[in-house]
Swiss-Prot record:
Name of protein: Potassium-transporting ATPase ATP-binding subunit
Keyword Transport: yes
Keyword Ligase tagged: no
Enzyme Commission code(s) on record: 7.2.2.6
NCBIfam families in UniProt: ATPase_P-type (TIGR01494), kdpB (TIGR01497)
Entries under PROSITE patterns matching the protein: ATPASE_E1_E2 (PS00154)
Keyword annotations: ATP-binding, Cell membrane, Ion transport, Magnesium, Membrane, Metal-binding, Nucleotide-binding, Phosphoprotein, Potassium, Potassium transport, Translocase, Transmembrane, Transmembrane helix, Transport
Main subcellular location: membrane
Oligomeric form and interacting partners: The system is composed of three essential subunits: KdpA, KdpB and KdpC.
Organism listed in the record: Bacillus mycoides (strain KBAB4)
Top-level taxonomic group: Bacteria
Organism lineage string: Bacteria, Bacillati, Bacillota, Bacilli, Bacillales
CDD domains: P-type_ATPase_K
Subcellular location: Cell membrane
Transmembrane annotation, as ranges: 55-75, 82-102, 245-265, 271-291, 605-625, 633-653, 677-697
Length: 697
């Protein structure tokens, strides 16, 4: 009997292995295609109209053109051999190509994602309901905002919209990558649907909320392709500083011949070009665009759609995070934690009636009561409950239960509501009911009273469990200097208990959606940058007010339009990871800038002695690396300057490993690694290259 089972398992495992192998092969093929395309784009980007957008690399390209021209214009006054000019020009060409390759590679990853998104934008037709009730089939491209469309099982949702009738399971894997379908229904915060997703069961009627070219997928394609990418304020500021440095060094190099003529010797033009390229920050200049694009790419890979690079950078500077309790800090499903009998009742009696009141209750709380009673092996008569008439929970009554066929009425619900119900039937209230209810509230739980007719048997302790690891994550945020504020509709007692258990810094109890705006503004008035999550229409104003607003993809259109980031997985806790990605982006840019500028120190010690030693013998003292000759020193510095760019591409694309710590500790760590390392690595690299170059000249 066991053999068929074993064979079946083996086949399943083999098919899974083959599927994984296919995915790996596809990923490798995609990577090869991206690299091949990036190599082609490296040459296409040599167009001066494109290069001028990066002033640093544009200067290098001009240097390449000058030295290339000099290679074909022999001069009797030149102090360097003819091959030197062509060698310098080739090194400068590869320097520009490597920088272009870094940018094209980052862009290529985005375009690959865009291509996969375009797969969902096939020729889709929609069943439009006209004003007279007729149903007409039209192309999705002809849909306009306000059109009413019916989508049946197996059909593609033609454009973004909101469900106004019906309920259906929707496959959103084309957008989110998650294979499990999600429920979409009319009303509430889960009525929003996205064009390109598919209805897998039932039928829904939707109202279109976007015109062609304005849909969610259109925005995603535009963003990941980089068409809508604008440089962030920090990126612009850094680019301005680097361009200013380049201009200063350009003036220095251009005026240098005046100084050397005064000393009685001349410097060859190719050497001056080499000096300029070694002086300007070419490393960070060549990688700056790639770092920004890769930062957006990392967020996208995390299934978060950032509406701009500014939003990602702002996430890295966040000081305060506003978090909802339910679904973010806690699981959001209150589960039966324990049973508390009152008066002279027993736990078996409480469990029996609690279970009977919950047999027909399909809510998570009702299911958890049944599961708890079963785990405690408490017996109850399920059959009499199933034969009874279920009384659903209502906001007015604040309780639910079942009316049995023999006339017995079983109820469970809010303390005050059940006490009032029992008293209306002439029942007496045990003295310890309120005492035990307060005890449950103090521990952060929710008390439900169980009563049968005019008699209270006890309480159900419902507990909304804090998600595992939240305290540790909040501690990491605290180390990063980020304050966490929990907003909840719970009473202050329950809120304080949950806040203490989770480890948040502050909490706001009995918080209404409009109160969140006040909390955000109060933090911003202190000069803080604030992040928050939300999914409902009532969250939209606060999402718009926050510096980083992360909306859930399952939420309303209003929430997604107000936010500057959208989480495709609809996981509110992801805001913590988004902050980490933002900090990683800022750190990567800062660290590579530090490394690039520190690099120049070693290049100075290589190229400056090589230029001036013949005229000023005392400059030989600066040749601390003992390089072979002036020409080999210049070429070695240029070669290192070129090859360091492709060597740093993986770091620019992946980002620097980020560990939560204080700003001062982070600064010290990066200065040690990328500042000191930026000085040491070029000394070693230039010396090794010089030893190799010295063998050929």
């Amino acid at each position: 009997m066991m053999r068929p089972v074993v064979v079946k398992e083996k086949r399943v495992n083999e098919s899974q292995i083959h599927a994984v192998e296919d995915e790996v092969r596809q990923a490798k093929t995609m990577d090869r295609d991206i690299v091949t395309h990036a190599m082609k784009q490296s040459f296409a980007k040599l167009n001066p109209k494109v290069m001028i957008k990066n002033p640093i690399m544009f200067v290098v390209e001009i240097g390449f053109i000058i030295t290339l021209i000099l290679s074909f214009l022999p001069s009797s006054s030149s102090s360097v051999p003819g091959w030197f000019n062509i060698t310098v020009s080739l090194i400068l060409l590869f320097t520009v190509l490597f920088a272009n390759f870094a940018e094209a590679l980052a862009e290529g990853r985005g375009k690959a994602q865009a291509d996969s998104l375009k797969q969902s934008k096939k020729d889709v037709f929609a069943n439009v309901v006209k004003e007279n009730g007729d149903i007409v089939q039209v192309s999705a491209t002809d849909l306009r905002k306000g059109d009413i469309v019916i989508v049946k099982q197996g059909e593609m949702i033609p454009n973004d919209g909101e469900v106004i009738k019906g309920l259906a399971s929707v496959d959103e894997s084309a957008i989110t990558g998650e294979s499990a379908p999600v429920i979409k229904e009319a009303g509430g915060d889960f009525c929003s649907v996205t064009g390109g997703t598919m209805v897998v069961s039932d039928e829904i009627t939707i109202v279109i909320t976007s015109n062609p070219g304005e849909s969610f997928i259109d925005k995603m394609i535009s963003l990941v392709e980089g068409a809508a990418r604008q440089k962030t304020p920090n990126e612009i500021a850094l680019n301005t500083v680097l361009t200013s440095l380049t201009l200063i060094f350009l003036i220095v190099v251009v005026t240098l011949p005046i100084f050397t003529n005064y000393l009685g010797f001349q410097i060859d033009t190719a050497v001056l070009v080499a000096l300029l390229v070694c002086l300007i920050p070419t490393t960070i200049g060549g990688l700056l665009s790639a770092i920004g694009i890769a930062g957006m790419d990392r967020v996208t890979k995390f299934n978060v759609l950032a509406m701009s690079g500014k939003a990602v950078e702002a996430a890295g500077d966040i000081n305060t995070i506003i978090l909802d309790k339910t679904g973010t800090i806690t699981f959001g499903n209150r589960m039966a934690h324990t049973l508390l009998p009152v008066g002279n009742e027993t736990i078996e009696q409480v469990g029996k009636w609690a279970a009977i009141s919950s047999v027909l209750d399909e809510t998570p709380e009702g299911r958890s009561v049944i599961e708890y009673v079963q785990t405690k092996s408490i017996s109850y008569n399920r059959e009499i409950a199933e034969q009874g008439e279920f009384v659903p929970f209502k906001a007015e009554t604040r309780m639910s239960g079942v009316d049995l066929q023999d006339g017995t009425k079983v109820r469970k619900g809010a303390v005050g509501a059940v006490i009032e119900w029992v008293q209306s039937q002439g029942g007496m209230i045990p003295k310890d009911v309120n005492q035990k209810a307060d005890l449950i509230s103090k521990e952060g739980g929710t008390p439900l009273v169980v009563a049968v007719d005019n008699r209270i048997y006890g309480l159900i302790y419902l507990k909304d469990t804090v998600k595992p690891g939240m305290r540790e994550r909040f501690e990491q945020l605290r180390q990063m200097g980020i304050k966490t504020v929990m907003c909840t509709g719970d009473n202050p007692l329950t809120a304080a208990t949950i806040a203490k258990e989770a480890g948040v810094d502050e909490f706001v109890a009995e918080c209404k959606p409009e109160d969140k705006i006040a909390v955000i503004k109060a933090e911003q008035d202190k000069g803080k940058l604030v992040a928050m999550t939300g999914d409902g229409t009532n969250d939209a104003p606060a999402l718009a007010q926050a510096d980083v607003g992360l909306a859930m993809n399952s939420g309303t259109t209003a929430a997604k339009e107000a936010a500057n980031m959208i989480d495709l997985d609809s996981n509110p806790t992801k805001i913590i990871e988004v902050v980490g990605i933002g900090k990683q982006l800022l750190m990567t840019r800062g660290a590579l800038t530090t490394f690039s500028i520190a690099n120049d120190i070693a290049k100075y010690f290589a190229i400056i002695p090589a230029m001036f030693t013949l005229a000023i013998p005392q400059m030989e003292a600066l040749n601390i690396m003992k390089l072979t000759s002036p020409l080999s020193a210049i070429l070695s510095a240029l070669i290192f300057n070129a090859v360091i760019i492709p060597l740093l591409i993986p770091l620019a694309m992946k980002g620097i490993a980020y560990k939560p710590m204080s700003s001062n500790a982070l600064l010290s760590r990066n200065l040690l690694i990328y500042g000191l390392g930026g000085v040491i690595v070029p000394f070693i690299g230039i010396k090794v290259i010089d030893m190799i170059v010295g063998l050929f000249i």
